[in-house]
Amino acid sequence: MESELSANVIDLCPVGALTSKPYAFEARPWDLKKTETIDVMDAVGSNIRVDTYGWEVKRILPRINEDINEEWISDKTRYACDGLLKQRIDTPYIRENGQLKKTTWENAKKELINKIKSFSPNEVAGIVGDLSDLEMIYSFKSFFNSIGSNNLECRQDRIYINPEERINYIFNSSIKGIENSDLILLVGSNPRLEASILNARIRKAYQNNNTKIYSIGDPGDLTYPYEIIGSNTSIIKLIAAGSHEISEKIKKSKKPIIIIGESALYGEAGRYIFETIKKFLFTNNFIRNDWNALNVLTQQASRVGAIDLGLYSIAKNKNFSFFDKLENGLFKFIYLLGADDINFK
């Protein structure tokens, strides 16, 4: 079975003939501690239950939430827990003479404080990783504010964001709202890989409502038919000007949805794509209280919350000022909070 949701057949099996191989013979259900929580493998926010035995996570199961994941979870969500037990860093290390050596938390804190004190606030920067929880992010920001530095960023890439309004960086139509849409336009997005639960909703909308689906860019097999209308930013310009056939289709639709993927938001081109689409939707009254067709599909669980907390450095008309300073070597000390994807070359 080729599907990102294939393991859900385990939950569907009425007699227990289909079982989870990694969980087989691991524990008895009544011995497990059950904790209800939220999935962090993508930005969908699927409701899950984590079953633990002692310190080990034995299995992850879906919880019903009709507004988000219904009763499904992705295979990635279900099986990612096998990496939680082994090869974990459970003690701090300090590099001495090119070698990492174990140390105590007290010594690590002293080393950190001494390093930070040796630089001015403008030379100190912090980057938050994609799996950092909001309480940790808030504490991280408070710490930087206490030393007089505002050089904070939650983006490990040059993704364009407009934090002036919250609607600029969230999925406004809601996941459940996909089922009510009569037209969906994907812009630089592959929902099957980026958010498989959301992709299942799009498939459901197509099957039940015959929703028309279009894409700018070729995302490959999405498990439902769609029409590719172009592959570059010139299509966005034509749509905004009303000179592309999809423009009229969007205008005639009752509840259109435009999903902008992160790959369409890189750099200054991302600024143009987002702002042009938003202006087009606003002009045609598709950004309303009862229906908002503007949707940004992020891939990181903590990205929206970090933006809400102000973890970004944006100067006037410069969305990427933090990265410009980083590339120009203006930061002498960089504090990475779970940020592993920064390329310092």
Identify what each model region corresponds to.
Residues 2-6, 10, 16-345:
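Catalytic alpha/large subunits of respiratory electron-transfer oxidoreductases
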